[in-house]
């Protein structure tokens, strides 16, 4: 009898044709096989859906109108059948032991969230890996361990589905920085979080392209400030501090300055 819990992987995609095969190949190569793969297409105009449909075991959900990553992720949450949920961006990659290590750590420690290491290929100085498994139960300790006020990326977490549904967590629509309020609340409501060595998420997005677009960068910066104000209000209402929040803001500004002074070369 198979007692391994099912993991639902939610992959939002908009015109990600050139990444689809690499993304889904990562999933097919996983040591862990109890997976529900939801590929949520956000009205792509390229061949993303056609490529995804060639891969076995992938459920394709198509949006009737372009709603953004938040809409796609929220739809995936509604369709999830797994005990755990993981959000996987189509242009990134994961190590072959990713889900096996996360699930085993979550089950062994009865954790609501398992926290993966991150390899940031666009900015290696922000890579964060774990050397040992550690369990956190205090809210501020969990905030500090995850640096969720600094890096709110939802794809770093394997999250118990019941936690998301019990607290009605969702991604805010029409936002650039939608991960931050979602991840922040998930960490707050979790009773136990475990850091997991050997589970690496490879973040491959080129941040320079965003920071070199003045109009879009201005919109993202304004949105980030609104999301930070949102989590500050939440923290005040629930009487706790947010470790790493100011550090994250300063690093974001320094990253902006660096890209403007030393634009990345392409080709």
Stretches found by the model and what they are:
Residues 1-223, 261:
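Nucleotide-sugar donor-binding/catalytic module of glycosyltransferases
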Residues 140-144, 232, 251:
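Generic detector of well-ordered alpha-helical segments enriched in charged/polar residues
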Residues 222-226, 242-267:
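Non-catalytic, C-terminal membrane-associated alpha-helical segments of glycosyltransferases
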Residues 237-239:
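Short, solvent-exposed, charged loop/turn and helix-capping segments
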């Amino acid at each position: 009898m198979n007692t391994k819990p099912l993991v639902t992987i939610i992959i939002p995609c908009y015109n990600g044709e050139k990444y689809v095969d690499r993304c889904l190949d990562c999933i097919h190569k996983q040591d862990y096989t109890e997976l529900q793969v939801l590929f949520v297409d956000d009205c792509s105009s390229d061949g993303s859906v056609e490529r995804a449909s060639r891969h076995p075991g992938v459920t394709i959900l198509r949006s009737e109108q372009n709603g953004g990553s938040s809409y796609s992720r929220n739809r995936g949450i509604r369709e999830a059948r797994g005990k755990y949920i993981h959000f996987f961006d189509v242009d990134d990659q994961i190590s072959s032991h990713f889900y096996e290590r996360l699930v085993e750590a979550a089950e062994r420690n009865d954790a609501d969230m398992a926290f993966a290491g991150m390899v940031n290929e666009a900015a290696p100085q922000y890579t964060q890996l774990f050397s040992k498994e550690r369990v956190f139960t205090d809210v501020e300790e969990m905030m500090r361990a995850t640096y969720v006020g600094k890096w709110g990326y939802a794809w770093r977490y394997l999250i118990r589905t019941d936690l998301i549904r019990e607290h009605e967590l969702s991604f805010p629509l029409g936002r650039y920085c939608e991960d931050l309020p979602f991840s922040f609340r998930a960490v707050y409501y979790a009773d136990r979080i475990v850091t997991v060595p050997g589970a690496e998420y490879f973040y491959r997005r080129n941040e320079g392209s965003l920071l070199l677009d003045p109009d879009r960068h201005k919109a993202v910066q304004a949105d980030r400030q609104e999301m930070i104000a949102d989590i500050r209000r939440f923290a005040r209402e629930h009487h706790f501090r947010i470790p790493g929040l100011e550090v994250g803001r300063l690093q974001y500004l320094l990253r902006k300055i660096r890209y403007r002074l030393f634009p990345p070369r392409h080709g």
